[in-house]
Swiss-Prot record:
EC number(s) given by UniProt: 2.4.2.-, 2.4.2.22
Cell compartments where the protein resides: Cell inner membrane
Name of the protein: Xanthine-guanine phosphoribosyltransferase
Source taxonomy: Bacteria, Pseudomonadati, Pseudomonadota, Alphaproteobacteria, Hyphomicrobiales
Main location group: membrane
Species assigned in the record: Rhizobium johnstonii (strain DSM 114642 / LMG 32736 / 3841) (Rhizobium leguminosarum bv. viciae)
Residues the entry annotates as binding guanine: D102, I145
């Protein structure tokens, strides 16, 4: 599999630093979160880091699938919903965590379930920015982020070779 022109590979170390930066930003909100709802699968890793840093013990998942072929975003499929007790009061004490907001479709679907929750992600693309409350790094819409859990060691052509 060759990398697209605008590839953004993220190492484990970089992702850990960025997820901790997100935790710092969230801590600065002076808001008490009683639970994290992570959007799986991408939200699992940042949720683990953020839950440790903010001492949030209750972690729930919501399973929404949209990338069925790892390339193109397709129809949203809700595979697992959220525990009813976390949906009380619109989820006002809930922190929703994901790795990335791309088009914002996934966050928008989850926001219908938790309209008063705080939505946070590590990375954001312009179309997804309006659907989250807090993020760390914005990348262009046509950039493909390669997360460390999706990658092995691969060779990348130098940028200058593709500019020709």
């Amino acid at each position: 599999m060759s990398l697209p022109d605008k590839a953004f590979p993220v190492s484990w170390d970089q992702f850990h630093r960025d997820a901790r930066a997100l935790a710092w930003r969230l801590a600065g909100l002076n808001q008490t979160f009683k639970a994290i709802v992570c959007i799986t699968r991408g939200g699992l890793v940042p949720a683990a880091i953020i839950s440790r840093e903010l001492n949030i013990r209750l972690i729930e998942t919501v399973c929404v699938a949209s990338y069925h072929d790892y390339v193109n975003q397709g129809d949203m499929v809700l595979l697992k919903g959220i525990a009813p007790e976390l949906m009380e009061n619109g989820g006002e004490t809930v922190l929703v965590v994901d790795d990335l907001t791309d088009t914002g479709k996934t966050a928008a679907q989850v926001r219908t379930m938790l309209p008063r929750a705080h939505f946070a992600c590590v990375y954001a693309k312009p179309k997804g920015v309006p659907t989250v409350d807090t993020f760390i790094t914005e990348v262009s819409q046509d950039t493909w982020i390669y997360f460390p859990w999706d990658m092995g060691f691969t060779y990348q052509e130098p940028i200058a070779k593709g500019a020709g």
